[in-house]
A protein has these predicted regions:
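N-terminal Rossmann-like dinucleotide-binding module
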Residues: 1-43, 123, 133, 191
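NAD(P)-dependent dehydrogenases' Rossmann-like dinucleotide-binding region
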Residues: 5, 9, 120, 137-161, ...
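A structured beta-alpha segment of the ubiquitous adenosine-cofactor-binding alpha/beta core
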Residues: 47-62
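Beta-strand-loop-alpha-helix segment that lines the small-molecule cofactor/substrate pocket
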Residues: 63, 69-70, 74-122, 136, ...
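Flexible glycine/proline-enriched surface loops and loop-helix/loop-strand junctions
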Residues: 112, 168-177
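Active-site rim elements
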Residues: 118, 174-181, 207-210
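Oxidoreductase and adenylate-handling cofactor-binding alpha/beta cores
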Residues: 123-145, 181-208
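Conserved small/polar residues in nucleotide/adenosyl-binding loops
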Residues: 211-218
Length: 218
């Protein structure tokens, strides 16, 4: 396995791969040296790269795992499939529907496996819930209300202002699609899974609510 993207999510996967005896991580890639150094400490025998294309040139690598920022998912996945690698790519699949379609079309022609990391698909509690829904335990499903309780900040400290966008990419429109791709993708996927259908129409609205504030009445 070659691993591309060794930040927080990448290192989470790398630690989990240590529990799988037949998962042999032989190469690591990241364009941020501190992350690459941390990952290399987990797999000291693995080759290291700062350019994913050099990793893909290694013919001994059968599969790659991609845990880069969202804006890099599409082109790295497509390049990996063209290089003859199986691909596990973190969610969300890509920045745009057009990018997702491009990835899918290349995958269909490649003869390789492409898996997007929507982890609820193999979470036992979600699987059990879907079995009950599809068996009719709750009757006909006419609507779904999902929510996410999270009190965390996406902003991370940076050692230099020049690294702001590299490290805090989730906060910038050119690199991320915000809450919809970072969190709501899970909820949308659950809705499609539960109903066994894809949406015909989509509408959205949003707001920033400050429920913890006490406002004067006069």
């Amino acid at each position: 396995i070659g691993f591309i993207g060794t930040g927080s999510r990448g290192q989470y996967h790398l630690n989990n791969l240590k529990t799988i005896p037949y998962a042999d991580v032989v190469a690591l890639c990241d364009n941020y040296p501190p992350h690459l150094k941390e990952a290399s400490a987990l797999y000291p025998k693995a080759k290291t790269y700062d350019d994913y294309r050099k990793l893909l040139d290694d013919r001994d690598i059968q599969a790659v795992m991609i845990a880069t920022p969202l804006y890099e998912h599409a082109h790295i996945t497509i390049d990996a499939l063209h290089a003859g690698k199986h691909v596990f790519c973190e969610k969300s699949m890509a920045m745009t529907c057009a990018d997702c379609l491009d990835m899918y079309n290349v995958f269909k022609e490649s003869g390789k496996v492409m898996f997007i990391g929507q982890q609820r698909l193999y979470d036992p509690k979600y699987i059990k819930a879907m079995e009950m829904i599809h068996a009719g335990t709750f009757g006909e499903i006419n609507g779904i209300h999902t929510f996410w309780n999270r009190n965390g900040d996406w902003r991370r400290s940076v050692p230099s202002p020049s690294l702001e966008r590299l490290i805090n990419w989730r906060l910038y429109k050119e690199f991320s699609k915000g809450l919809m791709t970072e969190l709501a993708c899970h909820q949308l996927q659950i809705g499609s899974w539960a109903l066994q259908k894809l949406p015909e129409k989509v509408m959205g609205h949003g707001a920033v609510s400050y429920t913890h504030l006490t406002l004067p009445t006069s």
